[in-house]
Amino acid sequence: MTGEGYKQAIVVRRDLGMGRGKAAAQAAHASCEAVFLILESGRPEWRRWLEMWRLQGQAKVVLRVESLAELQEVYSKAVEEGLPASFVRDAGKTQLEPGTPTAAAVGPAPSRLVDRITGGLKLF
């Protein structure tokens, strides 16, 4: 589609009370994991989306949810829609217990598809 935009939405749990640096690190983990998933997937469509996203400047938006249930819902919807998505659990080395779900990423993918899942969320 000509002129189509691509982006990645990163969703971070606010209910955990993570410090700014911790939240930023979790967002980065989610972003990177989604890209690694695409590179390892062998799915040509996802690879094309990744390349277009890269060429367009790697647009990202960081959004918030207030609960684990909301985070799981975002991730599940992305997977159901066939979009690349990651789900991050903390290693437990600093502020959180090991295995605590902290963040997810949807995309990179066409913005219109990402927005179907994350369009109602607020900025982090």
Swiss-Prot record:
Assigned EC number? 3.1.1.29
Where in or outside the cell is it found? Answer: Cytoplasm
Q: Where are the transmembrane segments?
A: none
Could you tell me the Gene Ontology terms of the biological process aspect for this record? translation
The UniProt GO MF terms for this protein read: peptidyl-tRNA hydrolase activity
Which catalytic reaction applies to this protein?
an N-acyl-L-alpha-aminoacyl-tRNA + H2O = an N-acyl-L-amino acid + a tRNA + H(+)
**Can you name a GO cellular component term?**
cytosol
Judging by the UniProt lineage, the source's domain of life is Archaea
Sorted UniProt keywords: Cytoplasm, Hydrolase
One Pfam family cited in the UniProt record for this chain: PTH2
Read off the SUPFAM superfamilies from this record: Peptidyl-tRNA hydrolase II (SSF102462)
Family the UniProt entry places it in: Belongs to the PTH2 family.
What does the UniProt function comment say about this protein? Answer: The natural substrate for this enzyme may be peptidyl-tRNAs which drop off the ribosome during protein synthesis.
* Protein name, entry field: Peptidyl-tRNA hydrolase
Q: Give the source species.
A: Aeropyrum pernix (strain ATCC 700893 / DSM 11879 / JCM 9820 / NBRC 100138 / K1)
Gene name per UniProt:
pth
